[in-house]
Amino acid sequence: MATEGNNLSQYDKNTIPNAKDFRFGIVVSEWNEEITEGLFQGAFDAWIENGVQKENIVRWNVPGSFELIYGCKKMQQSFEMLDAIVAVGNVIQGETKHFDFVCDGVTQGIKDLNVQTDIPVIFCVLTDNNIEQSRARSGGKHGNKGTEAAIAAIKMAQLRKDAKFYKG
């Protein structure tokens, strides 16, 4: 396993753009709440640590990971001033093909939002084989994918800002 023994949430703060003026949205699935709350906390803490003001973070909840697509789309439409959105979910492999359908649908839906709209949506959906893997990646021994998603959101917000500058 590529992540075995590694905490993937370590980053060099000096390589992160100044985020004090950025505004972020985060849409969180209520399914597997233990995991998604850990991911949310990782993202929130990373934003605060990098200068984002609490009042510049908007959170919405949706029932499950499949609903993240609609939640992110509506957040884009409702808060056009947002610089990026993070979609937080967790799908754990079961005995049926439901896992595959949900994972494929969410992945394609988030991709479509990125292609069709101007506010970047960061994919922070854990797709693990079991709950232990999810725990390890939501604040456990492998770090917190929520932290990584927040850093990606900051970098994409900066890219979006830079692209607008060059466009004129």
UniProtKB/Swiss-Prot annotation:
It is an enzyme of class 2 (transferase). Its EC number is 2.5.1.78. GO terms for biological process: riboflavin biosynthetic process. It catalyses: (2S)-2-hydroxy-3-oxobutyl phosphate + 5-amino-6-(D-ribitylamino)uracil = 6,7-dimethyl-8-(1-D-ribityl)lumazine + phosphate + 2 H2O + H(+). One of its GO terms (cellular component) is riboflavin synthase complex. InterPro entries: LS, LS/RS, LS/RS_sf. Pfam families: DMRL_synthase. GO terms for molecular function: 6,7-dimethyl-8-ribityllumazine synthase activity. The active site is at residue 98. 5-amino-6-(D-ribitylamino)uracil binds at residues 31, 65-67, 90-92, 123. Keywords: Riboflavin biosynthesis, Transferase. Disulfide bonds: none annotated. Pathway: Cofactor biosynthesis; riboflavin biosynthesis; riboflavin from 2-hydroxy-3-oxobutyl phosphate and 5-amino-6-(D-ribitylamino)uracil: step 1/2. (2S)-2-hydroxy-3-oxobutyl phosphate binds at residues 95-96, 137. It comes from the Bacteria. Catalyzes the formation of 6,7-dimethyl-8-ribityllumazine by condensation of 5-amino-6-(D-ribitylamino)uracil with 3,4-dihydroxy-2-butanone 4-phosphate. This is the penultimate step in the biosynthesis of riboflavin. Belongs to the DMRL synthase family. This is 6,7-dimethyl-8-ribityllumazine synthase.
